[in-house]
Amino acid sequence: MKEYQVYLERARSRQQDFLYPLIFREYIYGLAYSHNWNRSIFVENGGYDDKYSLLNVKRLITRMYQQNHLIISTNDSNKNPFWGYNKNFYSQTISEGFAIVVEIPFFLQLSSSLEEAEIIKSYKNVRSIHSIFPFLEDKFTYLNYVSDIRIPYPIHLEILVQILRYWVKDAPFFHLLRLFLYHFSNWNRFITTKKSISTFSKSNPRLFLFLYNFYVCEYESIFLFLRNKSSHLRLKSFSVFLERIFFYAKREHLVEVFAKDFSYPLPFFKDPNIHYVRYQGKCILASKNVPFLMNKWKHYFIHLWQCFFDVWSQPRTININQLSEHSFQLLGYFSNVRLNRSVVRSQMLQNTFLIEIVSKKLDIIVPIIPLIRSLAKAKFCNVLGHPISKPVWADSSDFDIIERFLRICRNLSHYYNGSSKKKSLYRIKYILRLSCIKTLACKHKSTVRAFLKRSGSEELLEEFFTEEEEILSLIFPRDSFTLHRFYRNRIWYLDILFSNDLVNDE
């Protein structure tokens, strides 16, 4: 954040807060490269190839200076010397530059908003995606109905650019951004298909995620404004998760913009017990009241997307279910509310009564089938969950092979320790353990039994099962009963900023 502020102040002194000149600054690409190199990824540590060097970036910037971007047509893109060579590398490099430049003012706005709201000290804990689950455990046990909503994709990338134009007033920057999107995302089509958007998001993840998250931020801001107009209660629990998208600075602006259009009380049905949670492109809407009110909110969502963002959404794709009978998937977990029934005997004078007590508990379960499917796709097992060797890792040393498998097990245990039932997690770790043994046996051209008997690797491979207990023993007293009780219960970690890579393969 401090690096962003230094670079922005340097640009302000030259161009009075315009973003366009920053595209041609070499240090912007160096900052983008450093950001991605240091970013932690769960399953494997990633990085750029050797082609991404500051020398190549400098040549690219020089070539960009020599081109007249406003007169290049899409038909001439293959003939033009700037676009004609190593198109994928240019696309990735320029998109990183666009993303880092457009993020700078919003990072500064977020920082100032958090300081004004006096929540900067707790902001790091709020950033954890696992902070959502304690909220679910606290609130959802008192609710009755839930709606699992998939936020629709815009049919055209121009919608994302138009939303961004309300906040950034720099015409040359948007001209260059449109030129880039025209050449690298087939934007000359009237409707951008979901497949082409998916391809663009994979090749340019940072830029696409910024544009898409900004679109979701706009929709949530308007939705929260309408929600506040429909109820006299303040949504304290609702604002906790919106702190991550600089909502405090936007709320006052939205009130000014929509005050004229919504000067009278909105004809909404009062629903003070509605709760909303979102991560990535999926949101959960839950309420305690009758399904009729949930159905009203469903239509508000659809009309909001269609009227304000020109995004089409089918009403039949949004279902309303009873929370006790429906499981919803969020952040790689299956969650549902389980009813626990117990009978209590009560005696009054000479009469005895049996009272049935029904309590609710939120079950958060590891989805075993999607995880096995992800492991099969990564070649750790087959589609039935039977472990197989990983021949592509056979060239590494024994220590590196074991360390790779341990890293995956460690990350899965870290991510799924909040599960109500750990049996599925143990099965995943067992698959990875046998896959590791088979990989080592394949490397030494031996059978599994002969390899273990010859090398005596049983003690080393026991780390797959003992490492988690060693970590917990450092936190809790070394009492067997206490450690066993905490090991079976849920443990949420407030330092998880990214979902596991195996979780995203749904």
UniProtKB/Swiss-Prot annotation:
Say yes or no: keyword Transferase present: no
* Molecular-function GO term, any one: RNA binding
Q: What does the entry list under GO cellular component?
A: chloroplast
List the keywords (alphabetical): Chloroplast, mRNA processing, Plastid, RNA-binding, tRNA processing
| One biological process term in Gene Ontology | mRNA processing
Pfam families, per database record? Intron_maturas2 (PF01348), MatK_N (PF01824)
- Key word Plastid present in the record? yes
The signal peptide annotation in the UniProt record is: none
Name its cellular compartments: Plastid, Chloroplast
Q: What this chain does, per the record? A: Usually encoded in the trnK tRNA gene intron. Probably assists in splicing its own and other chloroplast group II introns.
Please give the family membership noted in the entry.
Answer: Belongs to the intron maturase 2 family. MatK subfamily.
What protein name is recorded for this chain? Maturase K
Q: Which organism is it from?
A: Trifolium hirtum
